[in-house]
């Protein structure tokens, strides 16, 4: 009987994170407070003795919403934890009860995120090594040394190392070593007990180890024995001579499964003898061991475990400040200890990526394996065979954290205690039978994992030969009806990689880049479904939390653009509110539309809404473009992209973004106050035409660069040194002179758009309702500006295969080369990026997309087309299909017998047939969020770093433009040599040319010289010199003898 991975609704179970968080608050928090908080406190205050008693069992919670002034997008829900305290006067026996506010925590919902300052934050999972016993080896003096690592529940560990070359076995704790036989002697185990319970009692090796320990004088010296006992007590923090180690709580099911003969309860003294036998088994190669990095030995950390671990640290600090928190005279609270730094500064709690619904889903799928010790360990970064079906083999971060931050596979579930589960369904004679649940990966080792779509031969007799994986090894076996797991090709990856149609024909590094680019794509206004699909476009929407799904079956009573009203089977009315023009964390717009109508019957988990990147319940974030691989006037240099104006006119890559402006009106006293008015000095009526009577921009107005958003004037009395001058001015003009300061808010360059909403909040400053504000503000204004970004030169376009480039030129349609059927291409891409990056998949997508474009159909290619039949079957299938349809009427341009898959094109300007042929097809392209308007800013002179002499980063620091590799290629394609020279030399780290240009512009007393060598190139020369390599440059002179002169480098 075989088993196949089962697809089910909930993949990564957010319910485990949600329930574990509240289980910690209800159950574990009380136990934690009892262990750390003392039950009684004594206070002395002005001749009064007070006794404070903590009532742990009366601990309660209260959920409140933060004031609306702090809610930018959503309502912030807080959980307040109160600890009741009992105050008793020891003299008068007077009793008071007060509730002490310990912590304020954000409320986590069932989708595993919370709200902080109105913005979504998510907890990134992290997996740790479970407590237990792990065996490993290392090479020392060309000899394998085996050791056992015991990891305890209190994060302490020690090693038992067997070194037969030195004829001893010793215990290593915190870089200190002493004999393991002597350690057993301290525990009360005699040598006769070791020989009695050990399986090697008749071997010479064990007797030799015992004899080497007895040779030392440590056994007979009582002072050394007492010293070692005290040292062991300080480390383990328990009575060493106990026969049962209650602190050594280790999961025995894994140990008994792997090695057997362990006791059922906690670690006993006899188990140390069994560990000694296992080390001798490994030395004699009678037993194989699992490494500590095996996925069996890991568990996922949930949000409840995270708070439980950090509460211990903060509770201990909280005890020390309790006397300062409570005034015994008034019995009131002074302040609450700040616990929010745990939520703001911790790298595991991040702002949710909301570029599109796909990026939000994949952000929840991240898994962190980073700690302070894993940065230089290469074993943690490698792909282990036990990760098949559980962790994605490709998806990871780039840079120094490569391999440390990975992603879950598509069909996994987090079970209790952080165990990863994969669900399977049994298959017998190609029919699905009963449902089977593998609780742990230990059970998976009882079955053979088959890659059923990988055939090794074309001969029919050998078609049943399968590649099988079992117990960390690959084998080749004949197919049988024994228990086996049929692992599909798509089950090895996450959803990001499964959106790439022909992933098998690409380089894995480019597939990773293509997956990252899809999660960074911006939702478009005029988007279309892709012609070539994988079948996972609809499945992503069912897994995503960005859409609204029906909680109960029922009938729609009312469906509008604001809410959906449904009556369920129990005659209950459920209202779903839609998100309308809300800003995401990455400044994109979240806008939901209803999918149901009045009177429709809906079922559980049915989609009720769609948003900005969904078409007909399917993920669609790009457009299908007709393109060809070639060149056009050199504008396609390297990865630069050329686009026709038809794409710009039809707004195929136009997107919406939103900015939020917040500002306060402050006051110091009655005479020094900020206010808004239409009568601002030195401004014309043309500038103030979009303002209302209060001096605030009107809703729906179009604002450009330099427009006024809000007028803000501060009036204060001027200060005079001589009062006589003040009286003279008052007698002449009849009015007092006021000092008016204009603090109006103007739109910066690149921030133009349309005002969508304005919010005004009046802060109540009365004595009854005090609200603590910054800078004594009495009024808060919030303006929402919606921006429409068109496709401009400098934006990034990308495909699904990691093929991305900077838009370098927007050409006229009539100037571009056209095909035989008078079709003009939408985009032109350089052809050199395919063979150098081994992206054969995008060639297949171009040909298949051309077929689907011609017949107006959508094609779902199988991942296992060539594997089930023979190699090159997919290429032959596509060519035969093109040739077959070539004979139909109107499709004779699809296939050229002389040039299969290619087309002959003509110049659009002259109509002359070009010599070379090009590969033309239809592929899906999308626009990345790295827009040129956000990156480009003006910078004449600015600060530089002292050591590297590079411009500082960021607009706030007046830093340089972030010109990368592809931006330089776009400038080179356009032939902008002077701009390129200015960016790479004068605005970069060429110190000599920079100083020469400054003196030339300021003083005009020096000539403008050529640019010299940059500082970064000088660093490379120094590194070459460190490798005993010398780099010299030569110039050819104009002499008739053609002598070479050495060019000196100033470094």
From Swiss-Prot:
It catalyses: RNA(n) + a ribonucleoside 5'-triphosphate = RNA(n+1) + diphosphate. One of its GO terms (cellular component) is DNA-directed RNA polymerase complex. Transmembrane segments: none annotated. GO terms for molecular function: DNA binding; DNA-directed RNA polymerase activity; ribonucleoside binding. InterPro entries: DNA-dir_RNA_pol_su2, DNA-dir_RNAP_su2_dom, DNA-dir_RNAP_su2_hyb_sf, RNA_pol_Rpb2_3, RNA_pol_Rpb2_7, RNA_pol_RPB2_OB-fold. It comes from the Eukaryota. Pfam families: RNA_pol_Rpb2_3, RNA_pol_Rpb2_6, RNA_pol_Rpb2_7. It is found in: Plastid, Apicoplast. It is an enzyme of class 2 (transferase). Its EC number is 2.7.7.6. The keyword Plastid applies. GO terms for biological process: DNA-templated transcription. Keywords: Apicoplast, DNA-directed RNA polymerase, Nucleotidyltransferase, Plastid, Transcription, Transferase. DNA-dependent RNA polymerase catalyzes the transcription of DNA into RNA using the four ribonucleoside triphosphates as substrates. Belongs to the RNA polymerase beta chain family. In plastids the minimal PEP RNA polymerase catalytic core is composed of four subunits: alpha, beta, beta', and beta''. When a (nuclear-encoded) sigma factor is associated with the core the holoenzyme is formed, which can initiate transcription (Potential). This is DNA-directed RNA polymerase subunit beta. It comes from Toxoplasma gondii. The gene is rpoB.
